[in-house]
Regions:
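Active-site helix of classical SDR
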Residues: 534, 571-572
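Residue(s) in the substrate-gating loop at a strand-loop-helix junction
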Residues: 555
Length: 577
């Protein structure tokens, strides 16, 4: 793994944050946190955490030892000083004398010791950071490390690779108990460069931000080097059966809507590496052993659904597989709910569906959620495949999985998401680069609608809107271009809920002498092209089973044409009928 630390950039962070009255300690903490957070091989979507111990004056001008630690759920790739809430350190260290502490009391105690009462909740692993006697502490869920800590012989392998460089911590759920255990382990192994937590991840530490970061890269690289030497013959099936993936996506979107009354984003992933693993002969025994790190279960549950290739042409068989997954999940909840008081079942739908021989679907209630599903499963896939080159993959048991999935402190990370009425809707706007189309797009974006703009070019489209939409260059009078655009939309989103047929061109001429070709061009652009895309998208809406909304921008010209706008008005008026 490449070490990305650059002294010039570190100095730049110090200088820029100094203008915001942020200390050097915290500025460097932010810098190395960004380095870790921008490497998807280390952390993903709010995972991992970092901290720094420093000194800060209180209201009376007295120096206090403080701990700045990542806020719960904050993304390490882009957080600022707000995402590293500060706490008084001494009160945290006093909790070492306690034998136990409930989660509720821990959260309340942490909040009562914040420097700023308006700060976000500090990480659920705050006490662990406090107890480790080092200035800087880094924690990641490195893919390479996860491949080694989820084995039936993890301790043996880790000792072989690291010897006395690290100490091994058995799996314990994050919180007070894990913090106490790590403190005990480090007190007996104070010369190590890191702690490796079985079924969880890795901690490194140091007297400086650079030392802690360097150790993370060094220890992860040792894991990567070991894994890269592992070889095993993998057998593959040959699946030649042609599958209409659009039919599969629309079928599943219909089923998900029927279960939840919500619109879902269902992306088909079929890059070479996304297809290759789905042809493995051991596919059905590879991904049903649990998560690679417990933090992932709140995002994609403990395992994906796998549908055999031979069943992908039958909507009934697809439905049967999804129903079986739901039943299994409900039974899992019923069996283990006693472990978390007052737990309420989450929706039982899979977030990843592997389609044997052709790829997999990543699913979410909006594009962002879908991308989280993809990224986490992509990491899970790599971790499990690498782990099985070494030995047998072995995750935590179902009791521990349930405790993590339904832990209130984890569920809190998902609160206040997906609350907008049109969340998950997919809208296509033709003529999207124009003033009307872009104004509609902007309104839709604010309602969490996923927006696709179709137009001949987007040179004049506002940059901010362009960043938030999928822009597809498309001539709506060209049938093959329309088909290509719709195929792309369905691959990326799985369906269409809204069509705003807004494109057009104002052909002019007096009806006393206008030429036939002008009328034909106007009808082609302002009527036939609309009819064509409306017809295609209407059929998609019918196929997905719960309809949609289609609106045509007819313009006032359709009922009250201005002078010499007859060619335009006639074509627009045609869409009224």
């Amino acid at each position: 793994m490449k070490n990305e630390w650059k002294e010039s950039l570190a100095k730049k962070y110090i200088k820029e944050y100094q203008l915001k009255k942020v200390s050097k300690d915290l500025a460097l903490r932010i810098y190395s946190t960004h380095l870790l957070g921008n490497n998807p091989e280390l952390v993903l979507h709010g995972g991992g955490n970092t901290s720094v111990k420093s000194i800060k004056k209180n209201l009376f001008g007295k120096d206090n030892d403080v701990l700045f630690v990542k806020g719960s759920g904050w993304d390490m790739s882009n957080l600022n000083e707000r995402g590293l809430p500060g706490l008084y350190l001494d009160p945290l260290l006093k909790t070492l004398s306690l034998k136990k502490m409930s989660d509720e009391k821990m959260v309340n105690y942490l909040r009562s010791n914040l420097l700023d009462s308006s700060s976000p909740n500090p990480s659920i692993e705050t006490l662990l950071h406090a107890y480790l006697p080092f200035k800087y502490v880094d924690h990641t869920h490195s893919n390479a490390i996860l491949s080694l800590v989820n084995l039936d012989n993890s301790k043996e392998i880790l000792n072989k690779i690291y010897k006395d460089k690290i100490a091994i911590v058995p799996y314990v759920m994050p919180g007070f108990e894990l913090a106490k255990l790590c403190h005990m382990v480090i007190s007996k192994n104070h010369k190590v460069e890191g702690l490796i937590l079985l079924n969880h991840g890795i901690f490194t530490f140091g007297s400086s931000a650079k030392q802690s970061y360097d150790r993370m890269i060094k220890l992860v690289t040792l894991a990567e080097n070991f894994l890269n030497k592992q070889k095993k013959l993998i057998k593959y099936n040959i699946n030649n059966k042609k599958i209409n993936i659009t039919d599969v996506q629309l079928c599943i979107r219909n089923l998900y809507h029927s279960f939840t009354n919500k619109r879902w984003i269902i992306k088909f992933n079929n890059k070479v590496e996304d297809v290759k693993f789905t042809n493995r002969k051991d596919l059905f025994n590879l991904f049903n052993k649990g998560p690679v790190t417990p933090d992932h279960v709140i995002r994609i549950k403990s395992e994906p659904l796998i549908i055999p290739n031979k069943h992908l042409s039958s909507s009934k068989m697809i439905s049967n597989h999804i129903n079986a997954y739901i039943k299994k999940y409900k039974n899992y909840f019923k069996k283990y709910k006693k472990n978390i008081t007052n737990s309420k079942i989450a929706d039982p739908l899979p977030r990843i569906i592997i389609l044997e021989g052709i790829g997999f679907l990543s699913i979410g209630l909006n594009k962002k959620e879908m991308q989280v599903s993809y990224d986490i499963f992509d990491a899970m896939k790599k971790v499990i495949i690498k782990a099985n080159l070494v030995s047998k993959f072995k995750s935590i048991n179902n009791t521990d999985i349930f405790k993590m999935e339904y832990w209130p402190l984890e569920r809190a990370k998902l609160n206040n998401q997906n609350t907008k009425k049109f969340n998950g809707n997919v809208a296509v706007i033709t003529g999207g680069a124009g003033k009307i189309g872009s104004a509609i797009a902007n309104k839709f974006i604010n309602e969490n609608i996923e927006v696709i703009l179709l137009d001949k070019n987007f040179k004049n489209l506002d940059v901010n809107i362009k960043k938030k939409c999928l822009c597809i260059e498309c001539d709506l009078t060209n049938n093959s271009q329309i088909n290509k655009a719709l195929n792309k939309i369905l691959t990326l989103f799985g369906g269409i809920d809204i069509l705003i047929a807004n494109s057009g061109a104002a052909f002019q001429g007096s009806m006393l002498n206008v030429k036939k070709d002008i009328l034909e061009k106007s009808l082609e652009v302002n009527f036939y092209s609309h009819h064509n895309i409306v017809q295609k998208i209407a059929n998609i809406m019918v196929s997905q089973g719960f309809g949609g909304s289609i609106s045509l921008n007819l313009s006032k010209q359709s009922i009250n044409p201005g002078k010499d706008f007859g060619p335009y008005g006639i074509a627009k008026a045609s869409s009224l009928f």
